[in-house]
A protein has these predicted regions:
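N-terminal ordered "arm"
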Residues: 11-55
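Short beta-strand-to-loop capping motifs
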Residues: 18, 72-78
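Short, conserved charged micro-motifs
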Residues: 25, 78-85
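Short, charge-patterned binding micro-sites
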Residues: 51-70
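Long, hydrophobic alpha/beta structural blocks
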Residues: 86-268
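Structural detector for short beta-strands of small beta-barrel domains
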Residues: 275-294
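OB-fold (S1/OB) nucleic-acid-binding surfaces
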Residues: 290-315
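Short nucleic-acid-contacting surface segments enriched for D/E, G, S/T with interspersed K/R
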Residues: 316-331
Length: 331
């Protein structure tokens, strides 16, 4: 028992944050994380939690797709070896030739400092500069690595600092390298059946109105499909109902804030409205909604004696609600 106690005392909790390893032309930070996890499974480590996929502010203009960063948390006796190997993975797999600016952050401690939590909360709803991220790393003496301009440090820091108050799960299936960039062939009828069988335990799989499969991306990235759901059991079950002839490399389940509306829990200050911020305002409709070219609806609300112009764009599918607003409605 004494030897076991010594071993436990020598263990280190290592938090790993990764972001911006992909580009519109390829790669995916979750796929890189999948490769890292496959490596870690062969090491003498223990996973403390599920891999976490944190989707930050969706209004960031230079996001590749879902503005997601990844956190891995492990217990290890050899953090130096692990960190060196993960740095090699990020260097080798990141699509820097097509504009990726990867960031990698390591933090060794069981407890995450409040400063990380505050940074993460800002990243959910605001635009954080690279300068701010690099300053945070320097002031807190954080071990980090980046390529390009270091934009990925923002998500990497934020991923480590993120606190789950609600979560869903996302099962991501990955293609073999020989299939990257090729058309994804998946049975639409099987996805329709999967949704009707597993909803509401799974969500955002198929759009009935447009008769469109939602689980498959459209770019050349390594993801074949992703299923989102409320439980591990539900996403695994759903994946068994999806039919395709393509032989896949494997899959990984992430704990995620996808579908929780986390970035909308921020009440915006009417005197501090800025482009790209996410959040909500509460006000009263003060002019009649107008439908403009393209079917988009525009109106204004009054918030603390300030008039704020609002737009509801047609792709949101709530323009019918918006155009029926009347003066005095509180929204």
């Amino acid at each position: 028992m004494k030897s076991m106690s010594i071993l436990l005392q020598n263990d280190t909790i290592l938090h790993i944050g990764i972001d911006d390893t992909d580009s519109p032309k390829g790669m995916c930070t979750t796929f890189l994380s999948y490769k890292i996890v496959k490596f870690l499974e062969r090491q003498e480590i223990e996973f403390v939690d599920f891999p976490s996929l944190i989707r930050f502010n969706p209004n960031i203009p230079w996001r590749t797709r879902g503005n997601g960063a990844v956190r891995l948390t492990i217990r290890t006796k050899n953090p130096k070896k692990i960190k060196n190997k993960i740095t090699q993975f990020v260097t080798s797999y990141s699509d820097t030739k097509n504009g990726a600016n990867p960031g990698l952050v390591f933090f060794q401690n069981k407890q995450i400092p409040v400063s990380f939590n505050k940074f993460s909360k800002l990243a959910l709803c605001k635009l954080i500069s690279r300068k701010h991220a690099k300053q945070f790393v320097s002031e807190n003496n954080i071990e980090s690595f980046y390529l390009g301009n270091g934009q990925g440090l923002v998500g990497a820091i934020g991923a480590i600092g993120y606190k789950f108050f609600d979560h869903t799960f996302e099962l991501l299936c990955y293609r073999k390298k020989s299939q990257f960039g090729k058309k994804r062939r998946i049975s639409k009828s099987s996805v329709k059946n999967m949704q009707s069988t597993t909803f509401p335990e799974t969500f955002s799989s198929y759009d009935k109105e447009s008769d469109r499969v939602l689980i498959t991306p459209h770019g050349p990235d390594p993801v074949f499909y992703g299923i989102r759901g409320e439980t591990i059991k539900s996403v695994v079950r759903a994946s068994t109902l999806v039919n395709s002839d393509e032989k896949l490399d494997g899959y990984m389940i992430f704990k995620s804030n996808q579908g929780t509306g986390d970035h909308l829990n921020n009440e915006l200050q009417v005197d501090e409205l800025k482009p790209f911020n996410s959040g909500f305002l509460i006000g009263e409709v003060c002019n009649k909604p107008v439908i403009e070219r393209g079917g988009h609806v525009f109106f204004s609300i009054k918030v603390k004696d300030r008039k704020i112009r609002c737009a509801v764009y047609k792709p949101t599918k709530i323009t019918n609600v918006a155009q029926n607003l009347i003066l005095g409605d509180k929204i």
